[in-house]
């Protein structure tokens, strides 16, 4: 579903496109964190929280851009391939499509939940088709906080996808997430370092399984 105009600016979509073509890593202290399976992950310290913002660049082979974007937007299918999803659904709030997402955390930590806006645009950049998906946390009275679950108030993600010229997808992803609570920042950063590449690998695997089903 398309969100109402105004959830994200035109400029934000084109910024994600631009990063896919030319990574914007200069002028800030972005550090190369890890390179694995054709994926490079950079991080930048957010001094206010002690947490890191992440930028991911790479290629997912044998997974077409359109299919990858469709799978990312398919909340029902994500419940099948993402083992950390406790609850995930879309709801109309004030004329906009809002996503509610509860994530399983290991005991004894409380689960986290998110309420966020998400929008997809398929753009034409000099004849190249680029799928861009933007997401950011929001608050809606209709989706209030739940007892025993910690609401994530700071969440932002950008995803830009185009063909790698073969059967795969060239991908750029930006990610920032502050899970709140009493989890030490070093543990959050350790989890993100592993979780970000694993998420992309899981999504690539979901592409393969989806193709087998159809």
Swiss-Prot record:
GO terms for molecular function: phosphatidylcholine binding; phosphatidylcholine transporter activity. The keyword Acetylation applies. SMART domains: START. Keywords: Acetylation, Cytoplasm, Lipid transport, Lipid-binding, Phosphoprotein, Transport. It comes from the Eukaryota. The modification Phosphoserine is found at residue 139. Residues 1-212 form the START domain. Coiled coil: none annotated. It is found in: Cytoplasm. Highest expression in liver, placenta, testis, kidney and heart. Low levels in brain and lung. No expression detected in thymus. GO terms for cellular component: cytosol. Pfam families: START. GO terms for biological process: lipid transport; negative regulation of cold-induced thermogenesis; phospholipid transport. Interacts with ACOT13/THEM2. This is Phosphatidylcholine transfer protein. It comes from Homo sapiens (Human). The gene is PCTP.
């Amino acid at each position: 579903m398309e969100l109402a105009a105004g959830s994200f600016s035109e400029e934000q979509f084109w910024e994600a496109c631009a990063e896919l073509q030319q990574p914007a890593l200069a002028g800030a202290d972005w550090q190369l964190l890890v390179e694995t399976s054709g994926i490079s992950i950079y991080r930048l310290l957010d001094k206010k929280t002690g947490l890191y913002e992440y930028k991911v660049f790479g290629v997912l082979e044998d997974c077409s851009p359109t299919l990858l974007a469709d799978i990312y937007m398919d909340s029902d299918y994500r419940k099948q391939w993402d083992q950390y999803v406790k609850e995930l659904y879309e709801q109309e709030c004030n004329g906009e499509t809002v996503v509610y997402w509860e994530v399983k955390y290991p005991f004894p930590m409380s689960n986290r939940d998110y309420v966020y806006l998400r929008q997809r645009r398929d753009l034409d950049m000099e004849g190249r088709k680029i799928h861009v998906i933007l997401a950011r946390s929001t608050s809606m009275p209709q989706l209030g906080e739940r007892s025993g679950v910690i609401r994530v108030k700071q969440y932002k993600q950008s995803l830009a996808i185009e063909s790698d010229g073969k059967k795969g997808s060239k991908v750029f992803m930006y990610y920032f997430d502050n899970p709140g609570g009493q989890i030490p920042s070093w543990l959050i950063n350790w989890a993100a370092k592993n979780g970000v590449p694993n998420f992309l690998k899981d999504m690539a695997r979901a592409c393969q399984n989806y193709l087998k089903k159809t």
